[in-house]
Amino acid sequence: MIGGDSVEAIERRLLAKYPEGSPSAEIIEMARIEAEDLFEIKAQIIQRMALYDPTGDWMARGARALDNPRTTSGEESLERLYDIWKDLQETGPLSDEFSRLQEKVFLKKGGPGGDPIA
C-alpha cells in the first residue's frame, strides 16, 4: 500500500461497473493487470511528489490527488498517469502537474500549514 491505495483497491474499483458475479475470469485477470500497472505508476508519482513536497501527506493519502471523479472507476487512465510522471521527471517542482497535485493533497498533521495534531 502506498498513498492510501493498493492493487486490490484499484482492482475492486475497476470491477465495480460489473454487476456482482458477472465479470468473466478473463475480465477479472485484465482488471488485475491494469490495477498493477496503475498502482506502479501511481507509486512512482507519489514517491516523486513526496520528495518534491515534504509538507504533503503523500505516502499516506497521496493517491487521492490522482483520482479522476469523471470516470466510472474514479481512476485516471494509464496514459494520463504516464503523462503526469513524464512532466514531473522533466520539469520537477516547476511543472504544472506538480502545482495541480500539490493543491489536491492533504498536508501532514502538525506540519507547517498542516492539520493540527489531535
UniProtKB/Swiss-Prot annotation:
GO cellular component: mitochondrion
Record carries keyword Mitochondrion: yes
Keywords assigned by UniProt, alphabetized: Mitochondrion
Localization of this protein: Mitochondrion
Mitochondrion in keyword set: yes
Principal location listed in the UniProt entry: mitochondrion
InterPro entries xrefs: Mt_uS3-like
Misc. comment: A stretch of 270 kb of the mitochondrial genome is duplicated within the centromere of chromosome 2 resulting in the duplication of the gene. The expression of this duplicated gene (At2g07674) is demonstrated.
Protein name per UniProt: Uncharacterized mitochondrial protein AtMg01010
Species annotation: Arabidopsis thaliana (Mouse-ear cress)
